Amino acid sequence: MGKEKTHVNVVVIGHVDSGKSTTTGHLIYKCGGIDKRTIEKFEKEAAELGKGSFKYAWVLDKLKAERERGITIDIALWKFETPKYHVTVIDAPGHRDFIKNMITGTSQADCAILIIAGGTGEFEAGISKDGQTREHALLAYTLGVRQLIVAVNKMDSVKWDKNRFEEIIKETSNFVKKVGYNPKTVPFVPISGWNGDNMIEASTNCPWYKGWEKETKAGKSTGKTLLEAIDAIEPPQRPTDKPLRLPLQDVYKIGGIGTVPVGRVETGIIKAGMVVTFAPAGVTTEVKSVEMHHEQLVEGVPGDNVGFNVKNVSVKEIRRGNVCGDSKNDPPKGCDSFTAQVIVLNHPGQISAGYSPVLDCHTAHIACKFDTLLEKIDRRTGKKMEDNPKFVKSGDASIVKMVPSKPMCVEAFTDYPPLGRFAVRDMRQTVAVGVIKSVEKSDKAGKVTKAAQKAAKK
């Protein structure tokens, strides 16, 4: 066994009919985690329903349907491998909760793959003014997804026309530039997801195509296929060197062991012997042990779902939504208020100061008041349009001062991304999403346990 490949997360974006499912399905199918039996079963069903030609998309539709019915399908199905990476497709948009998932993102994407339909008229529809594509690309960029690959799909429908491809590259370069990406760092790859052309092996249909190239930190990388472009993603920097932030998902009381908080390490590391602080509870104590899947861990790192045992803390003192951090290294604190950039997605009316919906930020679920609408901004450029607007409505972006109804721990997105983005829920749907720009932290002295005092003396 060589060293385990690095894991990367990709998100696939693009217009409804750009062929995202077929393309993603094809990658998973050819390089992926779907076992032969499942594939044969799907193929048989697809053939019976006369959808044989659709088999790659069909694979994905099956997975999606099962996912939406709440059947947790083996997430391995959404994985595939390149020579360098284990790739996980963390979401395929078109999925109705795509925007919410991107925001509360169970995981941060390292790279976005934008699929553009090359067909006549299709391309134009896909990136028109109100296009979804723009929205998804903008969202990816706003949420810190800094790497992008553009796949120009359905090249078979325009007979692999070189001029068409170049025209699309020119237009798309302008488009991604407006969103914030530097086109020189973006590989543009012509493909046919339907035929699987130029996805994994270089196509023989476009002798004119010399391959893609992109600028990287180290210089330049080149290749021909989509798989090579994914393999050329810059290795992600995992936030192990940041101070610890671990939002609690649950707190258990386990006989003979005591209090065991459980959650995912978002940044930093957690290990036995550390003195940690829970915010906004304001409790400081020592970590006795850390485990994952019932095995002791030397340390938990970002991405690990861990349980850890703490001394002298009762289950009543800490709860889901609290954040655990290192008491000696930028410990987490509660906040009195925070300022965020909020984009209203679908609200039937107008939102004005005083509006108090529920915010989902990391694992916290707390009502927050829109205290002051500070400015309205153009969501395409980020430029200010007016100061202190009276209200905002669907489609608007604004800077808002928010006040939580009870103690809450959040962070600026630039410091700790997973704790700096949120979804606004009201009327059983996501009405807005936001990114936190700054936080007014509250300083309250909390409880320091005997275990923590003892550990501090060591």
Swiss-Prot record:
<keyword id="KW-0547">Nucleotide-binding</keyword>
<feature type="binding site">
    <location>
        <begin position="91"/>
        <end position="95"/>
    </location>
    <ligand>
        <name>GTP</name>
    </ligand>
</feature>
<dbReference type="InterPro" id="IPR054696">
    <property type="entry name" value="GTP-eEF1A_C"/>
</dbReference>
<dbReference type="GO" id="GO:0005525">
    <property type="term" value="F:GTP binding"/>
</dbReference>
<keyword id="KW-0251">Elongation factor</keyword>
<feature type="modified residue" description="N6-methyllysine; alternate">
    <location>
        <position position="3"/>
    </location>
</feature>
<feature type="modified residue" description="N,N,N-trimethylglycine">
    <location>
        <position position="2"/>
    </location>
</feature>
<dbReference type="InterPro" id="IPR031157">
    <property type="entry name" value="G_TR_CS"/>
</dbReference>
<keyword id="KW-0963">Cytoplasm</keyword>
<dbReference type="InterPro" id="IPR050100">
    <property type="entry name" value="TRAFAC_GTPase_members"/>
</dbReference>
<feature type="modified residue" description="N6,N6,N6-trimethyllysine">
    <location>
        <position position="79"/>
    </location>
</feature>
<feature type="binding site">
    <location>
        <begin position="153"/>
        <end position="156"/>
    </location>
    <ligand>
        <name>GTP</name>
    </ligand>
</feature>
<comment type="function">
    <text>This protein promotes the GTP-dependent binding of aminoacyl-tRNA to the A-site of ribosomes during protein biosynthesis.</text>
</comment>
<dbReference type="Pfam" id="PF22594">
    <property type="entry name" value="GTP-eEF1A_C"/>
</dbReference>
<keyword id="KW-0488">Methylation</keyword>
<feature type="domain" description="tr-type G">
    <location>
        <begin position="5"/>
        <end position="240"/>
    </location>
</feature>
<feature type="modified residue" description="N6-methyllysine; alternate">
    <location>
        <position position="316"/>
    </location>
</feature>
<dbReference type="InterPro" id="IPR009001">
    <property type="entry name" value="Transl_elong_EF1A/Init_IF2_C"/>
</dbReference>
<dbReference type="GO" id="GO:0005737">
    <property type="term" value="C:cytoplasm"/>
</dbReference>
<feature type="region of interest" description="G4">
    <location>
        <begin position="153"/>
        <end position="156"/>
    </location>
</feature>
<dbReference type="Pfam" id="PF03144">
    <property type="entry name" value="GTP_EFTU_D2"/>
</dbReference>
<protein>
    <recommendedName>
        <fullName>Elongation factor 1-alpha</fullName>
    </recommendedName>
</protein>
<feature type="region of interest" description="G5">
    <location>
        <begin position="192"/>
        <end position="194"/>
    </location>
</feature>
<dbReference type="InterPro" id="IPR000795">
    <property type="entry name" value="T_Tr_GTP-bd_dom"/>
</dbReference>
<feature type="region of interest" description="G2">
    <location>
        <begin position="70"/>
        <end position="74"/>
    </location>
</feature>
<feature type="region of interest" description="G3">
    <location>
        <begin position="91"/>
        <end position="94"/>
    </location>
</feature>
<comment type="similarity">
    <text>Belongs to the TRAFAC class translation factor GTPase superfamily. Classic translation factor GTPase family. EF-Tu/EF-1A subfamily.</text>
</comment>
<feature type="modified residue" description="N6-methyllysine">
    <location>
        <position position="30"/>
    </location>
</feature>
<dbReference type="InterPro" id="IPR009000">
    <property type="entry name" value="Transl_B-barrel_sf"/>
</dbReference>
<dbReference type="GO" id="GO:0003746">
    <property type="term" value="F:translation elongation factor activity"/>
</dbReference>
<keyword id="KW-0342">GTP-binding</keyword>
<dbReference type="InterPro" id="IPR004539">
    <property type="entry name" value="Transl_elong_EF1A_euk/arc"/>
</dbReference>
<feature type="modified residue" description="N6-methyllysine">
    <location>
        <position position="390"/>
    </location>
</feature>
<dbReference type="InterPro" id="IPR027417">
    <property type="entry name" value="P-loop_NTPase"/>
</dbReference>
<feature type="region of interest" description="G1">
    <location>
        <begin position="14"/>
        <end position="21"/>
    </location>
</feature>
<dbReference type="Pfam" id="PF00009">
    <property type="entry name" value="GTP_EFTU"/>
</dbReference>
<feature type="binding site">
    <location>
        <begin position="14"/>
        <end position="21"/>
    </location>
    <ligand>
        <name>GTP</name>
    </ligand>
</feature>
<keyword id="KW-0648">Protein biosynthesis</keyword>
<dbReference type="GO" id="GO:0003924">
    <property type="term" value="F:GTPase activity"/>
</dbReference>
<comment type="pathway">
    <text>Protein biosynthesis; polypeptide chain elongation.</text>
</comment>
<dbReference type="InterPro" id="IPR004161">
    <property type="entry name" value="EFTu-like_2"/>
</dbReference>
<feature type="modified residue" description="N6,N6-dimethyllysine; alternate">
    <location>
        <position position="3"/>
    </location>
</feature>
